[in-house]
Amino acid sequence: MTVNKMPSEPPFGRHLIFASLTCLIDAVYKKRYHNQDVFILSILRMTRSKPVNRTTFCCLSLTAALILTACSSGGGGSGGGGVAADIGTGLADALTAPLDYKDKGLQSLMLDQSVRKNEKLKLSAQGAEKTYGNGDSLNTGKLKNDKVSRFDFIRQIEVDGQLITLESGEFQVYKQSHSALTALQTEQVQDSEDSGKMVAKRQFRIGDIAGEHTSFDKLPKGGSATYRGTAFGSDDAGGKLTYTIDFAAKQGHGKIEHLKSPELNVELAAAYIKPDEKRHAVISGSVLYNQDEKGSYSLGIFGGQAQEVAGSAEVETANGIQHIGLAAK
């Protein structure tokens, strides 16, 4: 009597582990992953190249589903450390939905430093895209608080009726209840010798810092407050900011900790709160590393009761000047 045997178990385990680790590594390093179809096709080929039993087929199907779920969320990959990323539908809504005054937190952010005059900034995420000019507003009401929201960006300029790409990469927005800041993680820039060609060049800079400014004249008259939040830079969102303000003395000081590079874990030297040209309360001071001055920092105070601070620091390191985004409440 002939017995029809079930197909034996193929060694699919390593494929499952490989595919899962690929998505996990992608999330850890915050890289966008646009080629998940390659893994899905590989899995389909595995099922066609040899017979598989029901258990194997179920496992491979589950792996494919996990890859699609994890990798399709790559546009808002984890901030790798302290700062989670916004991977919800809010990314697309920020580009397409009208302002809704029912949204929580800061509802809009005017783009001034992120895109200069005569330039265009194209943002895209989750199949949606929108082009902004200098002075246009980004709908931040749809973004999650205390998270880095990540968009793809292309910055362009029009010359003789032709749009020329200046740089491209990842556009980041960190939003709090009363303030927000933007950062640009550039991956490619225009070739200095060929305007129609792009070359790889990674650089990180802070764009706009804005929100509901605290008026210098309406600061608390006394007491002190300690703000705790995040410090993030290029490929490093795990930093912590601690900043204390003595309102009676109109003075503040703080520190940045837990960034990967020791040179970036610096003291924010004591500095006085001063009014800017619009009477907004701001603080500017020196950055210290091992008691040596290594740059500067600037913070704005935000909220009707000075609930938040947001700003940036520039730190001189062996690899040049590094920019750090700062936000705390």
Predicted regions and their residues:
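N-terminal amphipathic/hydrophobic targeting modules at extreme N-termini
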Residues: 2-16, 25, 41, 45
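Bacterial N-terminal signal peptides that target proteins for export
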Residues: 48-59
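Mature soluble binding/inhibitory domains
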Residues: 72-329
